[in-house]
Amino acid sequence: MPQITLVFISLSGNTLSFVKRLSLYLADNYDYHVKQINIKDLKHETFPVKEEFVAILPTYLEGGNGVDSGDVEILTTPLGEFIAAHGNAQRCLGIIGSGNKNFNHQYCLTAKQYAKRFGFPLLGDFELRGTPDDISRLAQVIMEASSRHSSNDTQTLPNS
Protein backbone atom coordinates (compact mmCIF):
# COMPACT_ATOMS: atom_id res chain seq x y z
CA MET A 1 0.00 0.00 0.00
CA PRO A 2 1.51 3.37 -0.99
CA GLN A 3 1.93 5.99 1.72
CA ILE A 4 1.84 9.77 1.93
CA THR A 5 2.66 11.86 4.97
CA LEU A 6 0.77 15.04 5.86
CA VAL A 7 2.71 17.45 8.07
CA PHE A 8 0.47 20.16 9.48
CA ILE A 9 -0.32 22.41 12.39
CA SER A 10 -3.84 22.87 13.70
CA LEU A 11 -4.67 25.47 16.31
CA SER A 12 -8.45 25.94 16.15
CA GLY A 13 -9.32 22.46 14.88
CA ASN A 14 -10.16 23.48 11.30
CA THR A 15 -6.95 22.11 9.80
CA LEU A 16 -7.15 18.92 11.88
CA SER A 17 -10.71 18.35 10.66
CA PHE A 18 -9.58 18.82 7.06
CA VAL A 19 -6.57 16.50 7.47
CA LYS A 20 -8.72 13.75 9.00
CA ARG A 21 -11.26 13.93 6.17
CA LEU A 22 -8.53 14.15 3.52
CA SER A 23 -6.78 11.12 5.02
CA LEU A 24 -9.97 9.06 4.89
CA TYR A 25 -10.60 10.16 1.31
CA LEU A 26 -7.08 9.19 0.22
CA ALA A 27 -7.43 5.80 1.93
CA ASP A 28 -10.90 5.06 0.54
CA ASN A 29 -10.40 6.37 -3.00
CA TYR A 30 -6.70 5.82 -3.70
CA ASP A 31 -5.83 2.99 -1.29
CA TYR A 32 -3.17 5.18 0.32
CA HIS A 33 -1.98 4.87 3.89
CA VAL A 34 -1.75 8.39 5.31
CA LYS A 35 0.66 9.22 8.10
CA GLN A 36 -0.23 12.42 9.98
CA ILE A 37 2.27 14.60 11.84
CA ASN A 38 0.62 17.42 13.80
CA ILE A 39 3.42 19.81 14.68
CA LYS A 40 1.39 21.15 17.61
CA ASP A 41 1.80 17.76 19.33
CA LEU A 42 5.60 17.84 19.01
CA LYS A 43 6.16 20.72 21.45
CA HIS A 44 8.78 22.35 19.15
CA GLU A 45 10.71 19.10 18.59
CA THR A 46 12.04 18.41 15.11
CA PHE A 47 13.22 15.23 13.43
CA PRO A 48 14.09 14.20 9.89
CA VAL A 49 11.15 13.09 7.79
CA LYS A 50 12.44 10.21 5.69
CA GLU A 51 9.55 10.05 3.23
CA GLU A 52 7.96 12.58 0.89
CA PHE A 53 5.28 14.71 2.51
CA VAL A 54 2.79 17.49 1.92
CA ALA A 55 2.60 20.40 4.36
CA ILE A 56 -0.74 21.95 5.32
CA LEU A 57 -0.69 25.38 6.93
CA PRO A 58 -3.43 27.66 8.26
CA THR A 59 -2.96 31.43 8.11
CA TYR A 60 -2.41 33.31 11.35
CA LEU A 61 -0.98 36.79 10.80
CA GLU A 62 -0.60 39.95 12.81
CA GLY A 63 -0.51 43.43 11.36
CA GLY A 64 -0.40 44.65 7.81
CA ASN A 65 -2.73 44.01 4.93
CA GLY A 66 -0.72 41.40 3.05
CA VAL A 67 0.07 43.78 0.21
CA ASP A 68 1.98 46.92 1.10
CA SER A 69 2.15 47.20 4.86
CA GLY A 70 3.72 43.88 5.81
CA ASP A 71 2.57 41.11 8.08
CA VAL A 72 3.98 38.90 10.81
CA GLU A 73 3.33 35.16 11.04
CA ILE A 74 2.11 34.21 14.49
CA LEU A 75 1.37 30.87 16.16
CA THR A 76 2.30 28.68 13.16
CA THR A 77 6.07 29.26 13.10
CA PRO A 78 6.82 25.77 14.53
CA LEU A 79 5.80 24.28 11.16
CA GLY A 80 8.35 26.48 9.38
CA GLU A 81 11.02 25.46 11.89
CA PHE A 82 10.16 21.79 11.35
CA ILE A 83 10.36 22.10 7.56
CA ALA A 84 13.67 23.99 7.79
CA ALA A 85 15.27 21.38 10.10
CA HIS A 86 17.14 18.25 8.99
CA GLY A 87 16.72 18.93 5.27
CA ASN A 88 12.97 18.28 5.52
CA ALA A 89 12.20 20.94 2.91
CA GLN A 90 13.83 18.75 0.24
CA ARG A 91 11.27 16.01 0.89
CA CYS A 92 8.25 18.32 0.82
CA LEU A 93 6.18 17.87 -2.34
CA GLY A 94 4.46 21.20 -1.71
CA ILE A 95 2.17 23.07 0.63
CA ILE A 96 -1.58 23.53 0.94
CA GLY A 97 -2.79 26.71 2.60
CA SER A 98 -5.97 27.39 4.52
CA GLY A 99 -7.50 30.62 5.64
CA ASN A 100 -10.51 32.88 5.68
CA LYS A 101 -11.36 34.73 2.47
CA ASN A 102 -12.70 37.65 4.54
CA PHE A 103 -9.04 38.62 5.03
CA ASN A 104 -8.63 39.32 1.29
CA HIS A 105 -4.92 39.44 0.33
CA GLN A 106 -3.92 37.69 3.56
CA TYR A 107 -5.90 34.58 2.54
CA CYS A 108 -3.36 31.70 2.56
CA LEU A 109 -0.53 34.24 2.55
CA THR A 110 1.61 32.23 4.97
CA ALA A 111 1.50 29.16 2.68
CA LYS A 112 2.51 31.36 -0.27
CA GLN A 113 5.41 32.72 1.78
CA TYR A 114 6.54 29.19 2.75
CA ALA A 115 6.43 28.10 -0.91
CA LYS A 116 8.70 31.00 -1.83
CA ARG A 117 10.97 30.58 1.21
CA PHE A 118 11.54 26.84 0.76
CA GLY A 119 11.24 26.56 -3.03
CA PHE A 120 8.38 24.07 -3.22
CA PRO A 121 5.03 24.61 -4.93
CA LEU A 122 1.81 25.93 -3.47
CA LEU A 123 -0.39 22.94 -4.30
CA GLY A 124 -3.71 24.54 -3.44
CA ASP A 125 -5.87 26.11 -0.79
CA PHE A 126 -9.11 25.72 1.10
CA GLU A 127 -11.20 27.97 3.31
CA LEU A 128 -11.76 27.26 7.02
CA ARG A 129 -12.59 23.52 7.38
CA GLY A 130 -12.77 22.90 3.63
CA THR A 131 -15.64 21.41 1.65
CA PRO A 132 -16.08 17.91 0.22
CA ASP A 133 -15.12 19.40 -3.17
CA ASP A 134 -11.90 20.77 -1.62
CA ILE A 135 -11.11 17.31 -0.25
CA SER A 136 -11.51 15.56 -3.62
CA ARG A 137 -9.74 18.36 -5.54
CA LEU A 138 -6.74 18.49 -3.21
CA ALA A 139 -6.52 14.69 -2.94
CA GLN A 140 -6.13 14.62 -6.73
CA VAL A 141 -3.46 17.34 -6.56
CA ILE A 142 -1.57 15.36 -3.90
CA MET A 143 -1.74 12.20 -6.00
CA GLU A 144 -0.41 14.06 -9.05
CA ALA A 145 2.44 15.62 -7.04
CA SER A 146 3.32 12.24 -5.56
CA SER A 147 3.25 10.59 -9.00
CA ARG A 148 5.47 13.30 -10.51
CA HIS A 149 7.94 12.89 -7.67
CA SER A 150 7.93 9.09 -7.97
CA SER A 151 8.45 9.19 -11.73
CA ASN A 152 11.32 11.67 -11.32
CA ASP A 153 12.97 9.28 -8.85
CA THR A 154 12.75 6.33 -11.24
CA GLN A 155 13.89 8.10 -14.40
CA THR A 156 17.42 7.34 -15.48
CA LEU A 157 19.59 9.47 -17.66
CA PRO A 158 20.66 8.00 -21.00
CA ASN A 159 24.34 7.18 -21.44
CA SER A 160 26.23 9.98 -23.12
UniProtKB/Swiss-Prot annotation:
Molecular-function GO terms, alphabetical: FMN binding
Pfam families: Flavodoxin_NdrI (PF07972)
Intrachain S-S bonds: none
GO biological process: protein modification process
Domain of life: Bacteria
Transmembrane segments: none
Alphabetized InterPro entries for the sequence: Flavoprotein-like_sf (IPR029039), RNR_NrdI (IPR004465)
Protein family membership: Belongs to the NrdI family.
Protein name (Swiss-Prot/TrEMBL): Putative NrdI-like protein
Organism ancestry: Bacteria, Bacillati, Bacillota, Bacilli, Lactobacillales
